[in-house]
Every structure is written in structure tokens, then in C-alpha cells.
């Protein structure tokens, strides 16, 4: 799966700017929103190849967004991959996110621009999931 369009849902301005700058420099088309509600609206209104989803967000938690998009009978974003972004302290949240059909998760404290691009490349190379 070729990834071209990315939605970044991240409320930390410094981190969000780093992701967006790195992704733009790598040739991706990136939209960035800073709260959960706007993230959910954006994910529903545009067909993104990848969503970078922070767990701790204002307005709506990342796990709620994931549950809304993929937790029901229908996958509302069947053509999108999701990488959950989490902190060390949120191990249970990471597990919960993966149970709700996230495609991968990254520990925010360990993410560098290079590691982010490597994680995206791994998703691009992965075989399609059978649903």
C-alpha cells in the first residue's frame, strides 16, 4: 500500500510541527489537527492513507476516535492505516488501541523523524490485512 496522504492528530505543537515538517520533506501530503473532535471529523471527511493518532487529546481521547472509526461492525476508514502515538505511562492504552484495530503504535519519547518514516515504510511494505 502506497502511503501519500497523512492525517496527524497531535495536540503538542512542538511534536506536531516536527512530524509535519519531516513528513512534508519526505514528500507526503499532511493535514494536522490539534484536538480529538477535529481529528474525528477530518478522518471521516477525507480518505487518508495513514492517520497518526495521539492517545491523549483534548475534546476526545485517541482511543475514543479509534473505537468510533473501527470499533463497530463497520470499519469507517477501511483504506486508512492508523499508527497510535503514546507515552510510556500508557501501556494499557497502547494494548487497548491495538485491540481496537490500530495498525501499529509508537512510543512518543522514542520517535525521531527517521523512526517515524521507518514505521511508515514498514506499513507500506506490510501485506494487506484480511478482514
Show which residues each predicted segment covers:
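The feature encodes the CheY-like receiver
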Residues: 58, 90
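Charged docking surfaces used in two-component/phosphorelay signaling
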Residues: 17-25
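Conserved acidic carboxylate
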Residues: 10
Amino acid at each position: 500500500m502506497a502511503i501519500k496522504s497523512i492525517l496527524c492528530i497531535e495536540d503538542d505543537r512542538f511534536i506536531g510541527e516536527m512530524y509535519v515538517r519531516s513528513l512534508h520533506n519526505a514528500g507526503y501530503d499532511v493535514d494536522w489537527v490539534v484536538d480529538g473532535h477535529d481529528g474525528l471529523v477530518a478522518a471521516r471527511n477525507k480518505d487518508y492513507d495513514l492517520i497518526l493518532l495521539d492517545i491523549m487529546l483534548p475534546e476526545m481521547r485517541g482511543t475514543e476516535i479509534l473505537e468510533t472509526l473501527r470499533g463497530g461492525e463497520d470499519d469507517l476508514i477501511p483504506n486508512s492505516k492508523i499508527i497510535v502515538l503514546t507515552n510510556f505511562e500508557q501501556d494499557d492504552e497502547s494494548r487497548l488501541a491495538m485491540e481496537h484495530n490500530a495498525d501499529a503504535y509508537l512510543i512518543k519519547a522514542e520517535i525521531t523523524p527517521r523512526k517515524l518514516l521507518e514505521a511508515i515504510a514498514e506499513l507500506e511494505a506490510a501485506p494487506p490485512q484480511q478482514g
